[in-house]
């Protein structure tokens, strides 16, 4: 969740009926009553579900982190069952935007669903699941 121009925004992972992964954004003025705002999608189908999205800005760049399910493995990339990575967002995620190629946070096997927060001294801390059961 983040606040922009006096409005609170919340981003959630989604899967369409056509098995296309995306994120959805809701807005609220009071953090109690939420209404649908918009969808965030890649230009082409990218996985069937975007879990645990996290949107934040760091050093002038905008990040949309997500654990994407349903990626087909390549020779050395996307071979894990559980992917955790991010898109760089160009433009306004609430309006006109484009997403970069998906980049992995980690090339190991056990880092999933990362979320981040900003500390009082301005550092961004990211935490995620480790030791997946599969």
Q: What does each of the following model-derived ranges do?
A:
Residues 1-134:
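Carbohydrate-active catalytic/glycan-binding domains of CAZyme proteins
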């Amino acid at each position: 969740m983040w606040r922009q121009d006096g409005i609170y925004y919340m981003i959630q992972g989604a899967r369409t009926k056509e098995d296309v992964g995306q994120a959805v954004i809701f807005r609220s003025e009071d953090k109690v009553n939420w209404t649908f705002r918009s969808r965030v999608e890649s230009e082409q189908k990218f996985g069937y579900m975007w879990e645990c999205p996290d949107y934040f800005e760091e050093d002038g760049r905008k990040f949309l982190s997500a654990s994407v399910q349903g990626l087909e493995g390549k020779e050395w990339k996307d071979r894990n069952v559980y992917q955790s990575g991010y898109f760089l967002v160009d433009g306004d995620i609430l309006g006109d935007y484009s997403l970069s190629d998906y980049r992995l946070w980690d090339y190991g096997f056990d880092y999933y669903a990362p979320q981040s927060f900003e500390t009082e001294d301005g550092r961004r801390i990211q935490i995620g699941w480790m030791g997946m059961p599969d």
